[in-house]
A protein has these predicted regions:
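Cap/insert and terminal regions of metallo-dependent hydrolase folds
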Residues: 70, 77, 97-99, 103-106, ...
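Short hydrophobic/aromatic-enriched beta-strand-loop microsegments
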Residues: 36-37, 97, 114-123, 189-192
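Catalytic core of the metallo-beta-lactamase
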Residues: 25-28, 126-188, 204, 208-211
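Short active-site oxyanion
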Residues: 14-16, 93-97, 164-165
Length: 269
């Protein structure tokens, strides 16, 4: 679904979410615009011509975005921390702030991105009256041969005067979701990863399957969950078309509202 960004740039009041692709979401709420794990590159890899390439182009061009107040990054894997995209975002708007888990600020700063704030689990910061909370998740980090788990990974809660949004990042299912729901919920909307779960024996600890994604949204006390982290890059063994079907089927057995957006689609919440 092509989205030229016109309505997004004009929007100052309606809370919306737009799926750019993979774990990249544009959220507009309570007077702020922010991105999650932005990647516009064709290949998430240290070597651009080696690795999984996009199956679908980004839903909105970078240049067509509204002014971005801040970016949240879940961890340093190449499909979530994409330096070419981050550099371009920093150039497009010198006021954009970049929030990263502990151990990741140096990487951005060495690449010319100065407005970086490193956060630990439990840290919070106020942006224009909206709170950004760095929270636990169950994953790992690695960007080169000798840096496995040397930087932190996280999920994020964005809580404003009117709306509350949860971004699960990349994660396996864990009991911490219930704690997040108790402390920061309920959420109007939770973005949960539903892809990259096969083979299950290898992926289970760090990647939820669609049924677990539904349970995670229930645990954080979300009214509605939106599926993400699927259908953009072929990262694992399940068919690209399978995750949203299983996600919808699992959600329909519960009280949870479930959204499967087309890439580029905007929906209000």
């Amino acid at each position: 679904m092509a989205n030229n960004g016109n309505l997004l740039r004009e929007n100052n009041t309606t809370p919306t979410i737009t799926w750019i692709g993979h774990a990249t979401l544009l959220v507009q709420m309570d007077g702020v615009n922010f991105l999650t794990d932005p990647i516009w590159s064709n290949t998430p890899s240290p070597i651009p011509f080696i690795g999984p390439s996009r199956w679908v182009e980004p839903g909105v061009e970078l240049a067509d975005l509204p002014a971005i107040d801040f970016v949240v990054i879940s961890h340093n894997h190449y499909d979530h921390l994409d330096l070419p995209t981050l550099r371009e975002l920093a150039q497009l708007n010198t006021e954009t702030e970049f929030f990263v888990p502990m151990g990741n600020a140096d990487l951005l700063q060495k690449n010319g991105i100065s407005r970086v704030r490193e956060m630990n689990w439990g840290d919070s910061i106020n942006v224009k009256g909206t709170m950004v909370h760095c929270l636990p998740t169950q994953h790992w980090s690695k960007r080169s041969l000798n840096d496995t788990r040397k930087s932190l990974w996280s999920s994020w809660a964005i809580t404003g005067p009117q709306k509350r949004f949860y971004f699960a990042g990349d994660t396996g299912y864990f009991d911490g979701f219930k704690d997040i729901g108790d402390k920061f919920g309920p959420f109007d909307l939770a973005a949960v990863p539903v892809g990259a779960y096969e083979p299950r024996a290898m992926m289970k600890a760090t990647h939820m399957n669609p049924e677990e994604a539904v349970q995670s949204a229930l645990d954080v006390r979300a009214t509605t969950a939106v599926a993400m982290h699927y259908g953009t890059f072929d990262l694992s063994d399940e068919p690209l078309s399978e995750p949203p079907l299983r996600f919808k089927a699992a959600a329909e057995k519960t009280s949870l509202g479930s959204w499967v957006l087309a890439i580029g689609e905007t929906r209000s919440f």
